[in-house]
């Protein structure tokens, strides 16, 4: 169970610390004051290994387009250059942090047959780089993956450790949960 939780730069929350969390908690407040954002941050924190959770949160808020602007809705002040950080402690001594960064890069595609290497076009790609750090019994593990939305509201995810571009890419419009979600990608 989570005992302490911090939210940095997520939606309308610049910084929020929740301490001494119990098994039953109430969030009370006016409309549009951030109650749902706290729950969404907890959702990302509790299951960070599912590669399209970030995009699913936007869909729940009816931001159905998977484009650069809709991804920036996750960041405080719509500032994609900031870092979302979700940090928490568990009652079993585990410490966990989830970081989400927005990125844009220029990507080069060659023709499908890869024979006409002089005929290349460059376009911008964008997505979210998610990093999970987990410390259990003094041993830290780090999990990395990137999520790139596609036009059909699906996403592609790949591990940072892959040396070949997109060698192990998984197309994921929906991925069923794994028995142990923290085994998604082990760095």
Regions found by a protein language model. Give the residues of each.
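Pre-Walker A-like glycine/lysine-rich segment at the N-terminus of P-loop NTPase domains
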Residues: 1-47, 57-59
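Phosphate-coordinating catalytic segments in nucleotide- and nucleic-acid-processing enzymes
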Residues: 48-187
């Amino acid at each position: 169970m989570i005992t302490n939780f911090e939210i940095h730069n997520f939606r309308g929350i610049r910084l929020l610390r929740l301490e001494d969390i119990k098994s039953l908690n109430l969030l009370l407040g006016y409309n549009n004051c951030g109650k749902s954002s706290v729950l969404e941050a907890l959702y990302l924190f509790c299951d960070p290994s599912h590669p399209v959770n970030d995009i699913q949160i936007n869909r729940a808020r009816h931001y159905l387009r998977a484009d650069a602007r809709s991804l920036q809705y996750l960041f405080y002040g719509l500032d994609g250059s900031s870092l979302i950080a979700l940090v928490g402690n568990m009652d079993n001594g585990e410490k966990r942090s989830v970081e989400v960064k927005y990125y844009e890069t220029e990507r080069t595609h060659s023709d499908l047959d890869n024979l006409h290497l002089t005929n290349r076009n460059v376009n911008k790609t964008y997505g979210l780089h998610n990093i999970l750090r987990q410390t259990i019994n003094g041993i830290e593990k780090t999990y990395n993956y990137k999520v790139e939305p596609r036009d059909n509201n699906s996403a592609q995810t790949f591990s940072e450790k892959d040396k070949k571009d997109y060698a192990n890419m998984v197309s994921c419009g929906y991925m069923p949960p794994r028995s142990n979600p923290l085994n998604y990608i082990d760095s």
